[in-house]
Amino acid sequence: MINASVSELRRALDTRQVSSVELATLFLDRIAERNPALNAFITIDREGALAAARAADARIAAGTAGPLTGIPLAHKDLFCTEGVLTTCGSKMLADFVSPYDAHVVSRLKDAGAVSLGKTNMDEFAMGSSNESSHYGAVRNPWDTTRIPGGSSGGSAAAVAARLVPLATGSDTGGSVRQPASHTGVTGIKPTYGVVSRYGMIAYASSLDQGGAFGASAEDCALLLTAMAGFDPRDSTCLDRPAEDYAAALAPTAGGKPLAGLRIGLPREFFAEGMADDVRAAVDAALDQYRALGAVTVEVSLPNAKLAVPAYYVIAPAEASSNLSRFDGVRYGHRAAEYGDLNDMYCKSRAEGFGAEVKRRILVGTYVLSHGYYDAYYLQAQKLRRLIAQDFQAAFAQCDVIAGPTSPTTAWAIGEKADDPVQMYLSDIYTIAVNLAGLPGLSHPCGFGAGRLPVGLQLIGNYFGESRLLATAHQYQQASDWHLQRPE
């Protein structure tokens, strides 16, 4: 039952092989046993989970269950949850209990999913290793001396270790896809605006997007279907017809399920910088795609090399504005001793924020300051437009773009802690997708040295989530990398 897919759990619940309460208890007990070694969870809501499970059992008995009714999951700790701590991995919000649910949380509650708790994350989603959390580093289930990736490292590690079958995440520059790659799970970031950001604590508002983690593309499709949907409370949320992503996974007729699919391989993604073990796994995955009927074509993303510098101007600029609301006045950490109001602001923020958050606030404030706005922020926005245009030129030649999710496998905890630039470069293949607002997915495609997972990234055109999920699903029907477990 622990390793069952969401569809298998659905059948077990519907046929009364197991109850929602029994299933929730099974995973809660597993969290209690395994989480101390992984630190994947910040908050475990046993009482709330069992209450939700009892309600799910009532829905099943009444014949009104949906695909996720009674299925356990966890939320990244930046989604507001009514009555439950929402810390964003920060001392600043260590005692913050949200008075309302995020849109994603309320949709999943309505679907009958059972939330077991809140997962650990890089502080305010700023990081690529899950080492900046106020609650300590998350450890990779495949090797607990290594990072799981970030910033959604807790969600990725929880799914990889089967502490939960599903988890939510957020992706600003790769924060779903990169940890999915490092922990051997599947993760998808949809098109910007497909998932509401209401109640999702902001890092960089023009880049942030909620995403989904599961063992497989099928599991992610079921979760994303429930998460996505128009929300008038988020001005960037797109009012468009709802999609059933799971329904799009049906195979095409014939022995070559991906016949006719054109996969673009950006030459910039396969240049220097990719580790040999990652390259070998990615090449083998592409061979498997060709065997399934896809054809590969070389494309170019000439401005891809500028994505990281552009991102580290735009994202900190937006963060410096978004995080100005955390001042110790109405909620959040307040310094115990201060002289006047200005001193209270300074001390509360100095004590409440960690080093990486302070670094990005300083950078963001600098690039928005008088005399530097045109030189940095405006130029970065121009680069962003060029990157988006590069993708559109590439999609004129292909249906899906593929490449490595990360240039290396997971590194040792502490290895890059004192070198922010090296940490930032771990997202070199993922950041451009956020700058362009495109959907991206990472799925397991093999192992590198030390049996550390490697992920393949698939990038789609706008609203191409169904195609990405269906493409990954066909690969997973012909391979078993997504079935491998750390144990």
From Swiss-Prot:
GO terms for biological process: translation. Its EC number is 6.3.5.7. Disulfide bonds: none annotated. It catalyses: L-glutamyl-tRNA(Gln) + L-glutamine + ATP + H2O = L-glutaminyl-tRNA(Gln) + L-glutamate + ADP + phosphate + H(+). InterPro entries: Amidase, Amidase_CS, Amidase_dom, AS_sf, GatA. The active site is at 76 (charge relay system), 151 (charge relay system), 175 (acyl-ester intermediate). It comes from the Bacteria. One of its GO terms (cellular component) is glutamyl-tRNA(Gln) amidotransferase complex. GO terms for molecular function: ATP binding; glutaminyl-tRNA synthase (glutamine-hydrolyzing) activity. It is an enzyme of class 6 (ligase). It holds the Pfam family Amidase. Gene3D superfamilies: Amidase signature (AS) domain. Keywords: ATP-binding, Ligase, Nucleotide-binding, Protein biosynthesis. NCBIfam families: gatA. Heterotrimer of A, B and C subunits. Allows the formation of correctly charged Gln-tRNA(Gln) through the transamidation of misacylated Glu-tRNA(Gln) in organisms which lack glutaminyl-tRNA synthetase. The reaction takes place in the presence of glutamine and ATP through an activated gamma-phospho-Glu-tRNA(Gln). Belongs to the amidase family. GatA subfamily. This is Glutamyl-tRNA(Gln) amidotransferase subunit A.
